[in-house]
Amino acid sequence: GVDFSEALAAAEALEPVVGRLQAVGDGTDIRVIVDYAHTPDALERAICAVKETDNAGALWVLFGCGGDRDPGKRAEMGTIACRFADRVIVTSDNPRSESPEAIIDDILLGCDNSPIVEADRAAAIALAIAEAKVGDTVLIAGKGHETYQEIGGVRLPFNDAERAAQRLQQRQAA
């Protein structure tokens, strides 16, 4: 067996997994969490995990669906986000060779309310962080640990956590 104090010390030294319910910008007036959730099941689990934490404010969910992948999941993910979140922003997530707007239209088929649509992911992150009220949580889903956005066959540098951290700094400075 392992001594309990040794096991506890080892557990305390563990680092969180990048892009999996990753908190961004500790100490700010809103919570921002980045997660790789890119399937219906993963999105629902991420939303439910975030909702289980102590948070009195609204839950914002920002997500998109990848292009050239299973189009059948898009409306289902829209349904899940719109059912469980207080505010939803639908955006791009590696559209690859597809039109970002066409992917978003597929997602919107699953929404029975009116989510915010912003195809530019950087602008969507900026919008969510700017519009969130004190105590709100913003869940940025779909890319997690990825450091690129694939558009038209080109991988462009893009990191959800870095973009969110930049916007949080701007929010705190204002």
Language-model features: locations:
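ATP-dependent carboxylate-amine ligase
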Residues: 1-174
